[in-house]
Structures are given as C-alpha cells and as structure tokens.
Amino acid sequence: MNAPQENQASQDDADVLIIGAGPVGLTLANTLGMAGVRVIVAEKLPRIIDYPRAIGIDDESLRTLQAAGLSDQVQAHITPHHWMRFYTASGQCFASIEPRTDEYGWSRRNAFIQPQVDDILYRGLQRFDQVQVLLGHELHSFSQDDAGITATLKDADGVERTLRAKYLVASDGGNSLVRRMLNVAFEGRTKPNQWIVVDVRNDPLGTPHIDMHCDPQRPYVSAALPHGIRRFEFMVMPGETEEQLSRPENLAQLMRKVVADPDKVDYIRKRVYTHNARLAAQFRVDRILLAGDAAHIMPVWQGQGYNSGMRDASNLAWKLAMVVKGEARSDLLDSYEQERRDHARSMIHLSEVAGDIFAPESHTAAKVRDTVMLALNAVPPVKQYFAEMRFKPMPRYEQGVVLHHTGTGNQGVRTPFAGLLDRSGNTPLGRLLGLMAEKKESLVGRLVHGLETAASSPVGRMFIQPRVATANGHSGLLDDFVGLNFCILAWGTDPSYGMDEEALNFWQRLGARFIRAMPAGQLLHPTPTRDGVLTVGDEQGRLKDWFSAQGKSVVFVRPDRFVAALASPQEVSAVTRQMARVLHSPLEA
C-alpha cells in the first residue's frame, strides 16, 4: 500500500509554518517539536508580548503544558485552587466557584501571569534543533497548492523572505491577517462597554482569590495573582472615555473603591479592553488552519479565551504530526474543525452568560439576578453544582477521531437538579424554563441549555490522569509514562493480548504505549505480559473507579488525552481497524 502523499520528500523549509508567537503558536510549536516536526514560527513583533493579558489557566491547559515537558517550570508561576466569588452591591456573596477535584492531574482553576508562562514556552523551543523562531517578521502574502504553502515574510527593514511549508497555522490573534486574506467570516458581536484593567505590585489587599463585585453602579473585579501582583478591572460606564479614566485623579477615584489610599499603590500598568464574542466560520481552508484568537474570541469572565486556544493547540498538534510524517492522510485534519468549533462556540456562550450575570444591562436586571442567585445558592445541590464548576461545558467530541458505538450504552447522568430543568411540562418551573430555553441566545436559554443532562459515555471526553506507580519504584502522573503518544490501557490485563499481528503492528508503528493497570499492591507479584507492555499500580484507586463505571475494560486514548474508543479484550483488533479508518491511516506500512 502506498504511503500518504505528505510522506514524499520535498524541498520545504518546514513541515509547519506558524504565524504568531502568542501562547497558542508557542504551545503548538513546542508540541510539534517534541514530535520531531520541522517548524518555523514567524512573529511580526520584535519580541514576545510582555504585558499581562490572561490571568486564569485551567487543568486542561496545564495538562497540555505537561505534555510539552514544561509543567515543572510553569508551576513556579501559578496559584492553584483559585476560587471565584460573586458579590452583590451590598457585599453579599451569591455564588462561589471553587472546584476542589483534580481528575486531570491538576487544580481545575489556577491564577497565573501570562508573560512568565509565555517566556517559558518561548525558551522551551531552544530544545529543538528543527524549530526556528523568526521575530520581527511579518506575513506579507501567502498562497497554497496541492503540495504545500508558499509565504512571503518581511522584516523590520522591509527585506522579504519566501518560505515553503506543507501547512500553515494562523495563530495571529483576533485581527488575524491570515483569516482576513482567506475571507473567512468572523461572526459574532462586540460589547459596547469597555473595561480598564489596572495591575499593581505589592498586593494592597492580600486576599487569595478573585472577587467579582456585581455593583450595577460600576461592576469591578479584584484578582490575586502570583508573586504579589493584583489585578483590578473596572467597567467604563456610558459617557466615560479611556482618556478620562486614565487621568491620575480619576484613576485614584476608581481605586478608592478597593483601597484606602490610592497614592500608596505600586502601579505596574493600565490598559483598556473591549470584550468580543466571535467565531470563525471555518477553522480549515485546505492547508491553512486557524487556531486561538484567530479562530474564536470571547469575553474574559470565565478565563476561557486563553484555555480555548490551548485546546486548539493540543487537538491540532498530534494530527499535524501524523499527517506530515506520512502516518495519516490529510483528511485527518478535517476532524480539527469538527471537534473544536462547536466547543469553542459553547465556551463563547458560557463567557457571555457569565458576563450577563456579572454586569447586567440594567439595575432591574441586577436586582432580579441577586434575588434568583441568592435563592438558588440556598439549595445545597445547586450551590454544589456551581461550586464544582459543573456548568462549564467540557469538550465531548461527537464526531472526528472517536468511536461512540463501542461505548457503554449508558443513557446519561442527570444533574443534581435535573428535575427542576425538566422541560416535559411536569412542573410549573419546568414549563417556564422550557419556554425560555427555546431561545438559546437568551441568558436563561444558554444557562438552561448548559445545565441539561449530559451523556455519560467517556468516549470523546478527556481521560482522567491519576497518580500511578511502577514495580521499579517510579511514581508520577499517568501522562508522564505515556508521552505524546497513543495509549491503549487495560484494567487487569495485557491490552495487546487479544490483538492480531496486523493490529499490533499498526499501533507499534504509531509508537503507541500499551499499559496494564492494577491495584498498586499487586505490583509485587505481577503476571507476565508481552514485551513493551508497561504495568502500573493504581495508587489512588481512580483507574479502578473509572473502569468500574464502564462496560469495557480497554480504553484507547489519543495523544491529546481524549478517549477515542472503548473495547473488551476480545474486541481490540476489530476496534483497531475502526480506529485506522477514522484516523485515515493505513493498517499496513
């Protein structure tokens, strides 16, 4: 069987050209670098941006940085378990988001200072001889053909440089030149109000979390950040301008809402931001792919702009690596848009809902919000639902590189207050919510839609990351034993035992890891396995609990840690053939 076309020799300067050295471009370059892919990153600025933007990084993003081999360095610049609390104008807390679980190996909510993490990503590229960064080089033009893309860059002196690559990834921000030159629509809206953001040193408050003060007179945010930094954000009210609020006397007046003496505050910088909610109509145009803010932008209220971009990088990296190495046909890249676009839309909706709750458009709406939220907060299951951040739409891929028909067949798990949300007409509240939820673009519609029953099958969802141990005494998080590879993991049995030669050769050719999990105590007397199979002990009992909830004992995990399929030990060869099909990868070398 002939190898896919992308495996043919060429005179390309790189396999992948990345436009934009923000967090998405740098993360993608690091991950591709670890996979041995030749990468050029072009950034129009002379240096990576050094002013803070995002302040929240979630467990999924930290897991991505772990996969890139940089999590140890990043931990020095994060505050884990960073809760978010919402207060009425009178100072009464009406909601608290404080998830305390770590199913993916990391705290679910974390504060960080983005430039410090961006610098780690930038310096991380020095590990790879085949990765090059061109700072001060702006994209001037590009074209594509059946074999690749040709791009012309200009440096600060106007000197042009032409590059050839197999694929181009545009991570060049919300004002993406690539997206505009492709004439890809960027649908959505821009909020009319702006926010002035003030960062200060030597935290004048010292409280450890993020407080959202929902005062309709002027909503504001107070967020504790690592290294004694604090961020304040104040809404720019109608009739005010950035120039007015930036004057020392007016800024001091704003700061008196939060500190006793503004003159004693150690200011770092202040900037004004406008909140946008937009989604690209396409994430892929042949050999060009959009990622991060070039593909989607959203309000900051749940910190998901940065994290959505990191999800893009994680999803796209392993697929690009397979394609440029000739392990899969280019059709695999269609799954990037299939898997990421709908979830990006969901995160935009969540961010808009959070913004509507935080800063409603009228005093009357604020009073209704306070009354409703305080009432809901008095119901323990509802309070727990928000505290554990279960309202956050977790990625679940319905199509793409997933095999849903091999799942457990379970029909779903109901939310703690699913009865309240029953739209069948069995309760008055259910009938009311049902009517309001018909308009999913409304506040209530989006909220109800996000709280409804979710399917329980793990296929298409991120796999857990517990701590495991090996017989030789090594202990750590599961991903550290897998690397940037596929993983076939089984509970209590050798996952390769039931595989025929063709299936086994397929996974070995892709570098997949075979792992057998068992109770940690059984590591003292493990039964034999086939060569190359790693046996790990389930130190926390979480793998046992996970498999107990499934009807199958073998899980196929993708390099981005999402569950691709479930199987019984006797189905692994058949499932492998199905996996080869959805991966657009030949079974035979």
Swiss-Prot record:
Reactions the enzyme catalyzes: 3-(3-hydroxyphenyl)propanoate + NADH + O2 + H(+) = 3-(2,3-dihydroxyphenyl)propanoate + NAD(+) + H2O; (2E)-3-(3-hydroxyphenyl)prop-2-enoate + NADH + O2 + H(+) = (2E)-3-(2,3-dihydroxyphenyl)prop-2-enoate + NAD(+) + H2O
Sequence positions that bind FAD: 15-44, 283-293
Biological processes, Gene Ontology terms: 3-(3-hydroxy)phenylpropionate catabolic process; 3-phenylpropionate catabolic process
Keywords: Aromatic hydrocarbons catabolism, FAD, Flavoprotein, NAD, Oxidoreductase
Keyword Oxidoreductase: yes
InterPro entries in UniProt: 3-HPP/3HCI_hydroxylase, FAD-bd, FAD/NAD-bd_sf, PheA/TfdB_FAD_monoxygenase
Pathway in which this enzyme or protein is active: Aromatic compound metabolism; 3-phenylpropanoate degradation
Molecular function terms from GO: 3-(3-hydroxyphenyl)propionate hydroxylase activity; FAD binding
Cofactor(s) in the UniProt record: FAD
Leading EC class: oxidoreductase
EC number annotated for this UniProt entry: 1.14.13.127
Family: Belongs to the PheA/TfdB FAD monooxygenase family.
Role summary: Catalyzes the insertion of one atom of molecular oxygen into position 2 of the phenyl ring of 3-(3-hydroxyphenyl)propionate (3-HPP) and hydroxycinnamic acid (3HCI).
Listed name of the protein: 3-(3-hydroxy-phenyl)propionate/3-hydroxycinnamic acid hydroxylase
Gene: mhpA
